[in-house]
Amino acid sequence: MLDPKLLRDDPAKLIERLNTRGGDFTEVIEQLVALDSQRRASQTAFNRAQAEGNQIGKQVGERLRRGTAVGDPEVLALKQRGIDLKATLALLQDQERELAERFAALLPTLPNVPRPEVPIGKDENDNREMRFWGTPPIFDFEPAAHWDLGERLGLMNFARATLVAQARFVTLMGDGALLERALIAFMLDRHRAHGYIEILPPYLVNTASMTGTGQLPKFAEDSFRCRDDDLWLIPTAEVPVTNLYRDEILTDMQLPIHHCAFTPCFRREAGSYGRDTRGLIRLHQFHKVELVKFCRPEHSPTEHEKLVADAEDVLQQLELPYRVIELCTGDLGFGAARCFDLEVWLPSQNRYREISSCSNFEDFQARRANLRFKAPDKKGTEFVHTLNGSGLAVGRTFAAILENYQNRDGTVRVPEALKPYVRRDVLSR
């Protein structure tokens, strides 16, 4: 959620920055400015009426103490004015409450403001390539898609998952389940070695948690909801881990906080009809290891760089070719002020595909979740900055290993980093 001060100080500049995301936010911002102005005017009028009422009470008391009769015309006039002011106060209070509620409902619909260094662009075609790592493998045969490799080797079965649930689910079997479990353990071990504290959070969260991290109200259609209990299946571990500190004031000594968490993730993929209908790239249920950070505002750019490096480390250890891109304003996520995507090479598609998205939200989520800290050198409290990123999406890493490590005979070599977990060199039928 944006700082209301941005609306008051320079609404024209705010409109200009948000409009670089695509669309036109002019009308919404003008509505918010008007509501905020009306609410503050109502508050001022309330304060004045309240002060006048208090003064009238004192005047009546003074007259009565001096022996003025209760029925004196001046006393009666003052009392009537007091009665009128009470009615006015009630009216102004209701008016202010309504304006505040309308403002509070509209403000969360605005996305975060892109940082100044974010490249301006319309869509993914305008994203900026930052760097490449590794060399895509060259095969002397036509590389198979990961879903074909996986089913031939008995690692995965989509038909049985569809029988149990519906399309866009998978059942991992035998060495497929082993490889998935190995990847999860490997990723968590790497991040723990880098100082992250592991969390195993709830997989169901309440509406306040979904709102706190920005999934609601915008992404309600893409989420699975248990309506009878007002709970939501988590779309990412970012939601429960960030909300562990909701409505809390942290001490400066507690920061920075670095967490890693493995969870299943659940997404309806409402807007993805016809895209990635086969394989592990886009499922309703998938596994992910998430990295979540909380820090002081001045430290978030550096923490962002470290976050990206920690996600890259997993790909480098697995020796998977990838590239890093910076998202332009038009491709930036709703709550992100800046974002870097890691894209892994998939030989069957002859292109890089997203495997991690590392975002700096600055104070956007913290304002929604009321997550603050007390700095010893400043009065009052400040909102922390939050950051998160995949470290990594497990299913997509699984797919990348199958495709990049495949052999002509249909077997798949196990990356050196995973051999202590899988305890074999090759995956075969």
From Swiss-Prot:
Its EC number is 6.1.1.11. Gene3D superfamilies: Bira Bifunctional Protein, Domain 2, Serine-tRNA synthetase, tRNA binding domain. GO terms for biological process: selenocysteine biosynthetic process; seryl-tRNA aminoacylation. One of its GO terms (molecular function) is ATP binding. Disulfide bonds: none annotated. PROSITE patterns: AA_TRNA_LIGASE_II. GO terms for cellular component: cytoplasm. It is found in: Cytoplasm. ATP binds at R267, R268, E269, E354, I355, S356, S357. Transmembrane segments: none annotated. NCBIfam families: serS. HAMAP family: Ser_tRNA_synth_type1 (MF_00176). Catalyzes the attachment of serine to tRNA(Ser). Is also able to aminoacylate tRNA(Sec) with serine, to form the misacylated tRNA L-seryl-tRNA(Sec), which will be further converted into selenocysteinyl-tRNA(Sec). Consists of two distinct domains, a catalytic core and a N-terminal extension that is involved in tRNA binding. This is Serine--tRNA ligase. The gene is serS.
